[in-house]
């Protein structure tokens, strides 16, 4: 089983504790995602002007891009309470009913991993979202009866990394749908500089830029790398982070300029050395790496594919010429492109 990686996009307990201190509270402080910010500003102002609860919001995208942070920002901008829960926690319809009946008018209910709600819970959520009512069964057997409970108008914010797993009836009940994209190095540099200032870290702009460009387009990873570089600088550089210190810290962490760690490089090397660059089936690759198939598909592959180092074809995984160059190797000229792989037309 893969140990926790420094450049993993999933949250650790340390991340959650640190996020509380550096999390932006207003849209003006929420860096990046400009189209999403512009749209949400309009929706929030319109809802406040009408004195209504804002329409329900679905936020999706890869982990670590700020879905939870955006939900906090929305609640703060609306000036209402935020109740936070997650799909796996809501096991029974009664759990959801308890949450909904304790909301105040216009409050925001945030459900993380909303794709993991059970079908029974979803059935309760539908009328709550549409009509602000829930039907609850009282009693058992022949004496059982259904009662209808009115709810205060509220805004549901659902977050998911896997929007494709949402059922169509649930997805269709969200009036606002926002996709968060990977951040540019310039946006991440601004985030690192802001976080460093809040945490009291002495970090130069070029040091922040070096951290940002290795953060895989993800603020959570950028902030985690900043904390690790801070540790390095505190011991080796009197607490000062500049370009040279950031590079030395990244070398210690084995995070290269592309944001790859040893596991990423090992996967690319395995395909090149053991399978002649591919194609190779995911099961064979997992066995060669002594990793689970799910780890390859959900943890390692996405960023390699997004950056153009790896492709999935009908016959399996293949590395691209870009991967050969990154490993310091010369791409073979006699390998024909597979289906789905970019190649010369002539």
Swiss-Prot record:
Q: Which InterPro entries match?
A: AAA+_ATPase (IPR003593), AAA_lid_4 (IPR041445), DNA_helicase_Holl-junc_RuvB (IPR004605), P-loop_NTPase (IPR027417), RuvB-like_N (IPR008824), RuvB_C (IPR008823), WH-like_DNA-bd_sf (IPR036388), WH_DNA-bd_sf (IPR036390)
Which positions does UniProt annotate for DNA binding?
293, 312, 317
Location of region: Large ATPase domain (RuvB-L):
1-183
Q: Which reaction does it catalyse?
A: ATP + H2O = ADP + phosphate + H(+)
Where composition is biased (Polar residues), the residues are 1-11
Residues recorded as binding ATP, renumbered to this chain, are: 22-23, 64, 67-69, 130-132, 173, 183, 220
**Name under which the protein is recorded:** Holliday junction branch migration complex subunit RuvB
Look up and give the organism this protein is from.
Xanthomonas campestris pv. campestris (strain 8004)
């Amino acid at each position: 089983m893969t140990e926790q990686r420094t450049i993993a996009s999933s949250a650790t307990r340390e991340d959650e504790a640190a996020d509380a201190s550096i999390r932006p509270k207003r849209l003006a402080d929420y860096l990046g995602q400009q189209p999403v910010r512009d749209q949400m500003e309009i929706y929030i102002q319109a809802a406040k002007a009408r004195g209504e609860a804002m329409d329900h919001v679905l936020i999706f995208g890869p982990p670590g891009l700020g879905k939870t942070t955006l939900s906090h920002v929305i609640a703060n901008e609306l000036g209402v309470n935020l109740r936070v829960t997650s799909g796996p926690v809501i096991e029974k319809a009664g759990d959801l009913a308890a949450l909904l009946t304790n909301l105040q008018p216009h409050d925001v209910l945030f459900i993380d991993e909303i794709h993991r709600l059970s079908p029974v819970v979803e059935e309760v959520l539908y009328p709550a979202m549409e009509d602000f009512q829930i039907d609850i069964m009282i009693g058992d057997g022949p004496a059982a009866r259904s009662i209808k409970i009115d709810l205060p108008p509220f805004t549901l914010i659902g977050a998911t990394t896997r929007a494709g797993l949402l059922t169509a009836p649930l997805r269709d009940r969200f009036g606002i749908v926002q996709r968060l994209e990977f951040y540019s190095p310039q946006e991440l540099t601004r985030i690192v500089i802001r976080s460093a200032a809040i945490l009291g870290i002495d970090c130069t702009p070029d040091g922040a830029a070096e951290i940002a460009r290795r953060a895989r387009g993800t603020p959570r990873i950028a902030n985690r790398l900043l904390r690790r570089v801070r540790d390095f600088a505190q011991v080796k550089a009197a607490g000062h982070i500049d370009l040279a210190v950031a590079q030395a810290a990244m070398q210690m962490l084995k995070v290269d300029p592309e944001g790859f760690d040893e596991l990423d490089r090992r996967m690319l090397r395995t395909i090149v050395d053991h399978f002649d660059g591919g194609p190779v089936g995911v099961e064979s690759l997992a066995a060669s790496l002594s990793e689970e198939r799910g780890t390859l598909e959900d943890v390692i592959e996405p960023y390699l594919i997004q950056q153009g180092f790896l492709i999935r074809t009908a016959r399996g995984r293949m590395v691209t010429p870009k991967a050969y160059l990154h490993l310091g190797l010369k791409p073979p000229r006699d390998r024909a492109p597979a289906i789905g792989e970019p190649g010369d037309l002539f």
